């Protein structure tokens, strides 16, 4: 699972979790702007925008921030955002997938090249890494809200496929991408708290590398995560 590695100590994972929260906020704002550009600023007639506004509220993004970015998105000067995916091989045969949302693909591509120049690894052709991963829907359930055994009893009933407990803060209820909305609704109906839902990449096989390669991969992953346009970084390192 993304971000889980035996070479990452507790402090490193805590720092990455805090950083991740800021990334989630930023991603939602970019999705909001994109939705306005595609379907207009009125949530009554723009279903995608309506969904993203609710998502922003669920993430406790202040209303004034939502309103400000709705106005910003309506401006002709505001560029639209595009989703881009990059594939890399790190050290010891570890595959890495980077998902970004950007208003300037040339800038993001340049940032990716800088990352591998500074931290190693190699950018590869589309499909070279993706075949090692499966696309899944994931509902993020706070561990503070429910115990694993109780949640597990709901997973199958709600249409989920699996429960991942490796994250320190959240359980991940995994499902087919097309089932994500219905699984979330079913979980909510059973009183389960879902802090976030999104599509993720799950490794089909894990690569066990030595300590030196593991630490080099973490340094590369951390650099990638700190690129402004990058939202998520996935890898298949144990």
From Swiss-Prot:
It is found in: Cytoplasm. Keywords: Cytoplasm, DNA-binding, Transcription, Transcription regulation. Coiled coil: none annotated. Gene3D superfamilies: 1.10.10.200, 3.30.70.980. The keyword Transcription applies. One of its GO terms (cellular component) is cytosol. Its main location: cytoplasm. This is Probable transcriptional regulatory protein TC_0742.
């Amino acid at each position: 699972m993304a971000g889980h590695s035996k070479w990452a100590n507790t402090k490193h994972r805590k720092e990455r979790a805090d950083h991740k929260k800021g990334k989630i906020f930023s991603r939602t704002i970019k999705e909001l702007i994109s939705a306005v550009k595609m379907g207009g600023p009125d949530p009554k007639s723009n279903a995608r925008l309506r969904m993203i506004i609710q998502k922003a509220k669920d993430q406790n993004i202040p209303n004034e921030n939502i309103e400000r970015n709705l106005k910003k998105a309506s401006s002709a000067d505001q560029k639209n955002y595009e989703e881009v995916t990059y594939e890399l091989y790190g050290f010891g045969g570890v595959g890495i997938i980077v998902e970004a949302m950007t208003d300037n693909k040339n800038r993001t591509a340049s940032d990716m090249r800088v990352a591998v120049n500074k931290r190693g690894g190699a950018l590869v052709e589309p499909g070279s890494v993706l075949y090692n991963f499966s696309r899944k829907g994931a509902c993020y359930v706070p561990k503070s809200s429910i115990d694993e055994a109780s949640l597990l009893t709901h997973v199958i009933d709600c249409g989920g496929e699996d429960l991942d407990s490796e994250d320190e803060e959240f359980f991940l209820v995994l499902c087919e991408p097309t089932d994500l909305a219905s699984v979330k609704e079913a979980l909510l109906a059973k009183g389960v708290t879902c802090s976030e839902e999104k599509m993720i990449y799950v490794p089909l096989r894990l690569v066990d590398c030595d300590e030196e390669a593991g630490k080099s991969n973490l340094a590369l992953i951390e650099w990638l995560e700190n690129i402004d346009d990058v939202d998520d970084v996935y890898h298949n390192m144990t």
